[in-house]
């Protein structure tokens, strides 16, 4: 009981501190452009902030027990996430000051910089290997994951190329297709099948949105599936994820343990949940409960009602962005909106599908909920493009 009291007190203090600091940041970055912007832009902006803040509150609860057990600090993981939150808010608000056409003009710079970092992760003396995967580079005590950070700039660069595809020379087209392929293969080699698949699917769907001929799209599907099958056949742990997904109860204490515990966690929530901060499964039963499987802990604490409410919020967010895209006349900017929302929704829905046993374990985080500073930064930058698009839609229409 004393431990529970300590955890709850620390959580309450953290929430108070969090909102005070966020309020100060918003006051600093609240600029006049939002005072006269469309209702769509305002609503999209505040929905993004709500998603972010609510996700951080869920993370405080989901990570509290493990933080105390491993570091004797209930807020250890939250504090680290909060640092990235502040950095992300600053960067995203700065980016929202600039027209998307300007960001597209100079998108090559961050894209190739992070592209280079992705290649460096494969170098033995530079890339850091964790659990057999070489995906990180250490920078001042923080682990930088280029495959996460490149996601928003992946959208910008694809939009820039695909949006003016018919005006490009054959040589330029081949060059960029090779660059995109190298990026996907580099992530696949790390190995990181889930992120490589996400980048590939985003590329394919943006090609679909750009009205690429079906003969090219179907050809890339064959190439993508071949790469995925090859990766799975060469990496036994990826194959075991699929076999354990098909029948997790066959080996509930072995390969199926993660999914079985996730389903138990979700079932424990019932209709209304156990209450915020009172999850039992996060106390050592459900592995990676504050990262890839945080959605299961969320359902345990908020129940079926909470799960449906979150899903409705995400659907509303999606429809709001679609409305903005339909109001956008500029073809390249429309592609930016399509790519950004595709990236956000695929990660969200796949993470939920994995936690509920609908899809094999992927390793994709739940945007704004899962612990991971690199993913948080990428998602905030990605959403800043959507908000900026909503701002510009009013001006252009």
Curated annotation (Swiss-Prot):
Protein keywords: Cell shape, Cyanelle, Glycosyltransferase, Membrane, Peptidoglycan synthesis, Plastid, Transferase, Transmembrane, Transmembrane helix
EC number from the UniProt entry: 2.4.99.28
Broad enzyme group: transferase
Residue pairs linked by disulfide bridges in the UniProt entry: none
Biological process terms in GO annotation: cell division; regulation of cell shape
UniProt superkingdom: Eukaryota
One family name in Pfam for this protein: FTSW_RODA_SPOVE
An MF annotation (GO) of this entry: lipid-linked peptidoglycan transporter activity
Transmembrane segments: 46-66, 82-102, 109-129, 174-194, 198-218, 302-322, 339-359, 367-387
Membrane-protein topology: Multi-pass membrane protein
Predominant subcellular localization, coarse grouping: plastid
InterPro entries: Cell_cycle_FtsW-rel_CS, FtsW/RodA
Gene Ontology cellular component list: cell division site; cyanelle membrane; plasma membrane
Record bears the keyword DNA damage: no
Compartment(s): Plastid, Cyanelle membrane
Reactions performed catalytically: [GlcNAc-(1->4)-Mur2Ac(oyl-L-Ala-gamma-D-Glu-L-Lys-D-Ala-D-Ala)](n)-di-trans,octa-cis-undecaprenyl diphosphate + beta-D-GlcNAc-(1->4)-Mur2Ac(oyl-L-Ala-gamma-D-Glu-L-Lys-D-Ala-D-Ala)-di-trans,octa-cis-undecaprenyl diphosphate = [GlcNAc-(1->4)-Mur2Ac(oyl-L-Ala-gamma-D-Glu-L-Lys-D-Ala-D-Ala)](n+1)-di-trans,octa-cis-undecaprenyl diphosphate + di-trans,octa-cis-undecaprenyl diphosphate + H(+)
Chain's role: Could play a role in cyanelle division/peptidoglycan biosynthesis.
Family: Belongs to the SEDS family.
Family annotation (PANTHER family): CELL CYCLE PROTEIN (PTHR30474), PEPTIDOGLYCAN GLYCOSYLTRANSFERASE FTSW-RELATED (PTHR30474:SF2)
The protein's name: Putative peptidoglycan glycosyltransferase FtsW
Organism for this UniProt entry: Cyanophora paradoxa
Taxon lineage: Eukaryota, Glaucocystophyceae, Cyanophoraceae, Cyanophora
